[in-house]
Structures are given as structure tokens and as C-alpha cells.
Amino acid sequence: MPFVTVHMWSGRSKEAKAKVIKAITDALTESAGIPAEATQVAIIEVPQENWGIGGVCASERQAHQPHP
């Protein structure tokens, strides 16, 4: 039984997280033949200020990105 952990920035909707869980489950079913009911997915939400990219907090990087 696979257990998949996804770390991602916090702030996504309940619906978006449900889509992530379904997509991962479907991918394992289609690619490895694992029954959907055997797959577990955990989403761990991390605030951007606790996430570093290239030595800089993601919240700082986002603040300096141009917005469309």
C-alpha cells in the first residue's frame, strides 16, 4: 500500500487539494496497477515564510515577483 506525502505551500482550496489527491491516486492506479483504495495521500501545507528557495524565504521571493 503506497503512502504518498506532498509538501506544498498552504492556501490552496479544499477542492484543489482533493484534485491533487485524486490525480496522484489515479496516476498510481494507471501506471502501477495499484488499487485506488490501497493508496494513501497526505498533504502537508507549509507557509511560504517557512519554505526556502535558493536561500531565500518563498514569501520574500513571491513579494518581489511581478504580478500579472
Language model features: what each stretch is:
Residues 2-68:
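A domain-level signal for the structural core that forms small-molecule/cofactor-binding pockets
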